[in-house]
Amino acid sequence: MTTLRIATRKSPLALWQSEHVAAALRQHHPGLEVVLVPMSTRGDEMLDRSLAAIGGKGLFLKELELAMLRGEADCAVHSLKDVPMELDAPFVLPAILERGDPADALVSNLYASLQALPLGARVGTSSLRRQAQLRAARPDLELIDLRGNVNTRLAKLDNGGYDAIVLACAGLQRLGLEARISARLDAPEWLPAPAQGAVAVECRGDDARIYSLLAVLDAGRTRACVEAERAMNRALHGSCHVPVAAFARWEGQGLFLQGMVGSASDGRLIHADAHGSAEDTEALGRRVAQGLFDKGAAQLLAEL
């Protein structure tokens, strides 16, 4: 009996995603025993400050990667939007699963849409990307930092601290909370984080046995889209310090990639898009990034 150990964060959403991967692996590999190794990460523990202030989304990975290096786990499951653009050696992503809903969700107990929010409404989100698009759509809103897992954020809304909050649709759907979605915020008017809605499995690239076990879960069409989005972000030197959005979709045999850079302070948004080959997602990402630079993205990013 072969056993595969999956390192995972302890949040309900992370555990759901890891169990989803585990179930798929058991289906593909009858006889494979898959166990979860839940771990706490610095990103989960430091909830009093924004991610940008404490070092970025890579904080969600480091402890899981250390567990793999120490031989305590064979792989780790992540929301791909939390994975840095460049992985440290020897880590690789053998599997990116079929993408879930990439859109954002406005969640409110009183108001059915972004437009329905009253003047000066209090909206919770710590994402600079979401803040920039909220400021562009509704400059009057009071935007307030909001950290914690999905259930924690919903509890803060329900306790009256906010008129609305913005979360990822995929997270709510995976936790059976789709009924909490008041309005979808989606492309082309509203762009998600690069790779939002996609789950990735990480392992050591020097472990061929584990790599081959995981690679059967890879969804090629999803990988092409999210690699184009991440290539654009990489070309912009983006991180959670920077309000960057990207969304790629298949059109015929190729991809259509939309990108955005914004200002969370005043709501200025710069958009660019391009069609390209799914065989060269890096080139497509760089082309959209260059389109953003041509429209003044470098100056906007320099102000952050």
UniProtKB/Swiss-Prot annotation:
Cofactor(s) demanded: dipyrromethane
PROSITE patterns named in the record: PORPHOBILINOGEN_DEAM
Coiled coil: none
Assembly and oligomerization: Monomer.
Signal peptide: none
Keywords: Porphyrin biosynthesis, Transferase
Cofactor note: Binds 1 dipyrromethane group covalently.
UniProt xrefs under CDD domains: PBP2_EcHMBS_like
Any one Gene Ontology BP term: protoporphyrinogen IX biosynthetic process
Purpose of the protein: Tetrapolymerization of the monopyrrole PBG into the hydroxymethylbilane pre-uroporphyrinogen in several discrete steps.
Modified residues (S-(dipyrrolylmethanemethyl)cysteine): 240
Protein's UniProt name: Porphobilinogen deaminase
Family: Belongs to the HMBS family.
Note: The porphobilinogen subunits are added to the dipyrromethane group.
EC number(s) recorded for this UniProt protein: 2.5.1.61
GO cellular component assignments: cytoplasm
Keyword match Transferase: yes
Known catalytic reactions: 4 porphobilinogen + H2O = hydroxymethylbilane + 4 NH4(+)
A GO term, aspect molecular function: hydroxymethylbilane synthase activity
Cystine pairs: none
UniProt source species: Xanthomonas euvesicatoria pv. vesicatoria (strain 85-10)
Gene this protein is translated from: hemC
Pathway(s) annotated for this protein in UniProt: Porphyrin-containing compound metabolism; protoporphyrin-IX biosynthesis; coproporphyrinogen-III from 5-aminolevulinate: step 2/4
